[in-house]
Amino acid sequence: MSRFGFCCKWLNDPSETGGMKVNAVDRDINGRSTTMRWLREHKEEAEQRQWDIMNHNARAALLMVERVGAMVPERRMVRLGSEMLQGYTEPSWIDWWQRQEIQDHCEKIFAPVGEAARRLGVRLSFHPGQFCVLASEADEIVERSILEFEYHADMARWMGYGSSWHDHGFKINVHLSGKGGPAKFLRTLGKLSPEARNLIAIENDEMTNGIDVTLAVAEHCALTLDIHHHWINSGEYITPADPRARRVVESWRGARPALHYSVSREDILVDHDTGTRPDLGQLLDRGYRKQKLRAHSDFLWNTAVTDWALTFSEDWDIQVEAKGKNLATDQLHQQWLNQQ
């Protein structure tokens, strides 16, 4: 069964792509956060703020899963946000988070999220941010990155995932970042917990480590294919039949592979024909820069590019990374329905 998912937040209006308003509908389904500066400057209130945010965010994740789980089966896929637990890997807070009573409470409040996802058939994932660089040449950066990745593995473990290879399709997605390349990444992989190794998925990058590089680790972990990144990297509209795409499928060892999809921003490619795929070579010749073209669109404005993305839908689940979140995924789903 095809699945089409979105990332992290539920939007009710296109204006919310620029950030959720304080009085927005569904604040309870979206996460809250604070800053390390606020926590430092309000020491007497800091622990209570941490408790409030962790409880809100676990509850929000459950509500998100339940809402996605009430959608038609092909829409039951969502990425959960990384900012669930504030400062989990920060030196000033790491000991607090590792206290047994805190860990026990986290397991208690996150377990219902995983239970609901499995009951409702919702595929979940995480995506640590750009500072998670598992192939860095600097060992201190790698150690910090391991902490960050294991933070996501802890949340997945509390939700009941990680005991087997991508159980229920769960993945923790990260780029193969760092000048150490595949060799350094594989050394780092051996330092991760069994749950983290079971759930890690490596994504091709748009500027440096493309598909040909990530395939070097395909025998050791699942790969995520980001087709927008690949287009930025190579100018190619790769097909599902491409041998490289088939190797990505094989890396999942029977689990359903995941694909990331977006398109260059509509305010960059202004007046581009919505029924014609952009040609990267022509755009570069006209003075466009990859640094601008790589940015994710708000919505899936180019139907020709979406038609291409949908050629993968038979064998892949598609995660929409457009800033329009669920609203952008509505567009993808409707275009898919029109083809049925």
Please identify what each model-predicted range represents:
Residues 1-123, 132-146, 150, 154, ...:
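Alpha/beta catalytic barrel-like cores
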Residues 81-83, 124-129, 165-176:
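Core alpha/beta catalytic barrel or barrel-like domain that forms the active/cofactor pocket
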Residues 127, 226, 318:
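Conserved, mostly hydrophobic/aromatic
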Residues 142-222, 228:
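Eukaryote-skewed repeat-based solenoidal scaffolds used as protein-protein interaction platforms
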Residues 227-235:
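Short, acidic/turn-prone active-site loops that include or flank metal/cofactor-
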